[in-house]
Amino acid sequence: MVLVCASSSKCKRNTFLQLAMVLFAVVMARIALYFHNHLDEPLVDPYDANGNPQFSEANALKHVIHLSDDIGYRILGTIEQERAREYIMNEVLALQKQLQDGPNADIHQMEVSLESGDGAHRFDFMNKYVIKKYQNLKNIVVRLSNGTEACKEEAVLINAHVDSTLPSPGATDDALAVAILLEAIRIFISRPVPLTHSIVFLFNDAEESLQDASHMFITQSPLRDTIKCVVNLEACGTTGSEILFQATSNEMIKAYSHVPHPFGTVLADDVFRTGLILSDTDFRQFVQYGNLTGLDMAVVKNSYLYHTKKDLAPYISPGTPQNFGENILAILTYLVSPEADLNNMKSSGTVYFSVFNSLFFMYSKLTSKILNTLVGGLGILLTLRGSEGSFTVALIAQVISIAGIFVIPNIWAYILGNVLDCGMSWFRNEYWPLFIYLPAIFASLFFTESLFKRSEHLALRATIFIFSLLTFIPLPSAYLFTIIDFFMVFALFLNDKILAKPGTVHPLTYFIGSIGAMTVGFESAINLLEIFVPLTGRIGTDKVADNVVATVCVCGFNIYFPLMSPWIQRFRSRCCFRLGLLFSIFVVGFSSFILAKQDTYYDSLHPRRIFVQRMENITSNEVSLHIASADSAPGFDKLSSDLSSLLTDEPVVKTEMDDWNSDWDTVYPFSQFLGSYRIPLNDTVDVTTLPSIKFSNKVVKDNVVNVTVTVEHPGLIWTVVSFDADVLSWSLPEVPSTVRRHHVREVSAYGLDSYSFNMSYLEAPIYFDFVGVDGVGHYPSKASEGRDRASIQLCEKLTNDYLPDWTDTLCIGVVSGNFKLE
């Protein structure tokens, strides 16, 4: 994107330097991408040539395939979840017998238990409160120790969840983690090395229902008080290395430092804590209720298939299970050794990051402050030394330049999404946004840099001064600015002392000054793109996706090309600036036009998520179809209208999604991100066994009512009751006193169909809204068993005949009703 002006002798003289810098940037990016995407060859044999046990991807995939392909959709409350649990228990018991019959029976002790229980907890998400109630959940718990009480009293917990969510068979989320745990058990019992600390393997029953089974374990398990730390395994992608995105103690980060394929950064930790990812894991329950520290790790690349029907074993990239499994083995091997101090698990602000998936660095919060202060302080001193009034002007110009590359691309992003209605045209590829927003950034640079006449050296000093200030940001992820700034400060020092004449910049300064940016900085920029571009397909219908991605591109550009402003000033000429600006604008327009004119912004491997439910209301006797989307790309309104015209003569109705619209309460609080339409159907309600809400033991005293509420939901799963009331107390977790709208989501094991809670509230009529998913009315998981259901028939028809192949549909039958408590 750096232009050569043919009519300018200055541009001609510097053509070689321009090309050299471009080549340097490309080569560095190519090297970084190679290591970023590199995965070792998967292993097949469970033992190496010397007979030592090793992680076998082939073994792990057998478990993944059985759970996700053979058993399929492991939805809590269905028979498939019971079958998955039975399969895992059989595998665990077989491993236990293998240990008992093998040569290591006197070295290891393996205890297996099935822990069940009921409970409730409050789940807060994006300023929403939901009460979770669960019944008869069953966790498979395996403790591996040397048989002594001392070993058992200091345990490492490693967690994976067995269930999957609608509408996903959950190969990576989270059958892969389950398979890794099974492989880890096999390997540890095959090693003739006694454990100093025990390992508790938790195959938890319910994560997708908002982390119920992990809550049950950490609040009810007999082993909970022995747990000293936790390693949580998750996935939202299908390819690449798993990332360490939460690490909360120095000792656990030290454990991670032993992995053969490190890929983690405290920057991911800081981003995750902002809530921008709109996701959470079981790790939250272990921290909140167990006061544990630990590691949270997940496969995140290619999250286009997250929670879709294509989360299947064939889409897991070869090498991903091997990479993940070997890293987990290294972590556990350290944690069960005498070297690990499990009594030193205090939370810390340790800074950590990896480079090229090969090198791992960690240092304390104090060390971080010292390094940041030294590098930043030195940078400020060097840039301010001998400063004159012109530096102030250069600094103001640099601030305006940085502001420009944030503002101008975001203005264009707003126009694309909100004016031209062609937002998210780049969705199918994590790197396609660069075709639009990279030239927009250069256009901004050429424009703003042309406004101020400043020397190249002053522009360099101003750039380094600003990056030096960034090192003082009070976040662990400020390490990134420190590394980038270190090389720039070092380059400036060499330039001023050795390489160049006073007030000039030697070309080598740019190459030296860009080393940090084009290594650690590039990895960070790529990670942001790979996380946020697929994420825009599920962040809601507000038209902000292009602005989010434009901002990510700008941040990535500043991280990778921090010295672009002085570099442009090096070739300053009116001709170069004009041509650069015009060419950049042309590329922006051309790229935007080409991408916008695609027939669709999606394909089968990068699908649009569509949420469909056929709702039968037993109170109004109305049947309706609800169709919703979770992204802001164009076309959904037309898709809904076309669908309506195929099914009925009734007009489609746009519904307002708020806390008082219970249509999508089955996915509350995620429902707040949906844009939904309601299509009335000319069908009759055909619910064989009606749900009900019954009220008993009612006592009224001094305007306060005490009552027992019993919800009966035969044949329905994932039920929700929502209502407005001034609740004074109840047998459920407390909510803030300012909250009047309450949502109680209930899940239970297969076969249970009722639950109760006691409530005390200020006397006034209460209107309960009830919704529940038909236990055999979700498609395609129950396509065969529920083929006589109208919801299954409709879902099948929609999927096969109406909806494009670039959609991925959650399609369910829902029963709703309204009940009044006088």
UniProtKB/Swiss-Prot annotation:
Q: Which residues are glycosylated?
A: 146, 291, 617, 682, 706, 758
Per the record, what ranges lie on the membrane's Cytoplasmic side? 1-14, 385-392, 453-463, 507-514, 569-575
List the Pfam families: Peptidase_M28
**GO biological process terms, semicolon-separated:** endoplasmic reticulum unfolded protein response; proteolysis
Please name the CDD domains in this protein's record: M28_Fxna_like (cd03875)
Q: Which residues cross the membrane?
A: 15-35, 366-384, 393-413, 432-452, 464-484, 486-506, 515-535, 548-568, 576-596
Tell me which residues are marked as the site Transition state stabilizer: 306
- What does the record say about how the cofactor binds? Binds 2 Zn(2+) ions per subunit.
GO terms (molecular function) for this protein are: metal ion binding; metalloexopeptidase activity
Protein's UniProt name: Putative endoplasmic reticulum metallopeptidase 1
- Source species: Schizosaccharomyces pombe (strain 972 / ATCC 24843) (Fission yeast)
Gene name of the encoded protein: erm1
